[in-house]
Amino acid sequence: MAAEADEENCEALYVAGYLALYSKDEGELNITPEIVRSALPPTSKIPINIDHRKDCVVGEVIAIIEDIRGPFFLGIVRCPQLHAVLFEAAHSNFFGNRDSVLSPLERALYLVTNYLPSVSLSSKRLSPNEIPDGNFFTHVALCVVGRRVGTVVNYDCTPESSIEPFRVLSMESKARLLSLVKDYAGLNKVWKVSEDKLAKVLLSTAVNNMLLRDRWDVVAKRRREAGIMGHVYLQASTGYGLARITNVNGVESKLPNAGVINATFHPGGPIYDLALGVGESNEDCEKTVPHLKVTQLCRNDSDMASVAGNASNISPQPPSGVPTGGEFVLIPTAYYSQLLTGQTKNPQVSIGAPNNGQYIVGPYGSPHPPAFPPNTGGYGCPPGHFGGPYGFPGYPPPNRLEMQMSAFMNALAAERGIDLQTPCVNFPDKTDVRRPGKRDFKSMDQRELDSFYSGESQMDGEFPSNIYFPGEPTYITHRRRRVSPSYWQRRHRVSNGQHEELAGVVAKLQQEVTELKSQNGTQMPLSHHTNIPEGTRDPRISILLKQLQSVSGLCSSQNTTSTPHTDTVGQDVNAVEASSKAPLIQGSTADDADMFANQMMVGRC
């Protein structure tokens, strides 16, 4: 255990925060404005202990006031043993590269703020319809996470700086607290606790909260509920040590690159150093970091040039654990931005002046010349246009309005907690650019689909045979198309209909021949049959007769040379054959029906 702490060198730490928020808690934790008004002012001093241990008192409450959001307190913590135990338990790399520039008071503020960031109010349990008195508030305990909402506190070295980060606290409440501090008589009081007991209490606090899920996320949420912004020492992050944490405008972020110096510059506001993850005012940064010179934003071109000249002389110390073998150079972001801002103004070069700058040779086959003059504003970028004195001046630098708008948007996003790197999702889905060139089968009727699949759209005469689709090669239109089932069904219906029609004509012809024969009663020579008028005959019969006459000659010649055959058909068939072989009378004309029947009978051979 460390030696006995020096009580004279132990400075006081001031702690401030809300003890509760109205209408935020439920059950016995809820505190109403009527209860607070009845309990104020307290009749006795209210102690400040650790984790509700009454034998581990490290400070005292200076004042409690009623704010519109809830009871707000300001207290003092001065315990040399607490500083000694925390200093001995902290790792040597806990403060990173700021270990040599931080004072003992600042180290104590970092350790206490991050180890005990919240408070828990212990009050008297009230019975139903009981009105509280001045003994309602029992004590205030420093802890990791309190049960009530918005109970994260802020530690600092002065009363004014401890209540300053509470932006929602009214100015009247702040003035009343500061007036009560002047009347407080215990500013030089010291509270002593055994180091062994204090070490056990601190260890018990860590053990009892180690299973709390996402405790730093809960602390960050409670801090935002309390309205704390611009705080200095609270690091609500899961990273180990202060070198892995950044804190910009009260918004935490988890960054894996520990130990890299990276500062964010805000005009007239604090500077947040990524190497330490804390925010300090411009004056404090100049005092604590001698190798960094804090400058305000440039207001004109002469200021930009002066800032660029000063930034070129900056030689920051590399942090511990970072290789410095010439692989890279560590430059704070704020001064790198100022350096780029000072170099955006293009120099006025007279025509014909010699160019002694560096020339860069482009790759083989590049459309640009092998060498073009350097441009500090657009180095590493392709040439923008050809209208400058050299021909390739690069992209024009942004004007002052664009810079101001960019700074305004960044500040607005940081205030509202908006991540500008997150891609936007509030946009419509991308439309298919190839959709107009695709085939639209839904708008086609069945005939179009059949003609398209079969490739025989010329049969109906309404659609072209070679359908062309935009964007499709010519040879694709002539490829074999897939034939739909409806096409074959239609072809089958057409062929069956033709056969049925022919069979009907033949049946009608046979019926007509039978009727003519029945009128005469007996078989007569063909010359005695009367001719049937042309108007009463089916025109399709004449067409079929002409087609059969061309075939009858061949069939008759074959019958004359062939041997006679024995026909076992009935008497009607023999009669028809006899009539067909009867000689024609000279000068008579044969009837078309008889000729057709004769040819049909001859065709049977």
Curated annotation (Swiss-Prot):
UniProt-listed Enzyme Commission number(s): 3.4.21.97
One MF term in the entry's GO annotations: identical protein binding
Domain of life: Viruses
GO biological process: nuclear capsid assembly; proteolysis; viral release from host cell
Site (Cleavage): 236-237, 578-579
Active site positions, chain numbering: 52, 120, 139
UniProt-listed Gene3D superfamilies: Herpesvirus/Caudovirus protease domain (3.20.16.10)
Annotated GO CC locations: host cell cytoplasm; host cell nucleus
One Pfam family of this chain: Peptidase_S21
Chain residue ranges for the region called Interaction with pAP: 326-344
Alphabetized UniProt keyword annotations: Host cytoplasm, Host nucleus, Hydrolase, Phosphoprotein, Protease, Serine protease, Viral capsid assembly, Viral release from host cell
Region (Interaction with major capsid protein): 585-605
Domains as described in the record: Region of interaction between pPR and pAP is called Amino conserved domain (ACD). The region of interaction with major capsid protein is called carboxyl conserved domain (CCD).
Protein name, UniProt field: Capsid scaffolding protein
Organism: Varicella-zoster virus (strain Dumas)
Lineage: Viruses, Duplodnaviria, Heunggongvirae, Peploviricota, Herviviricetes
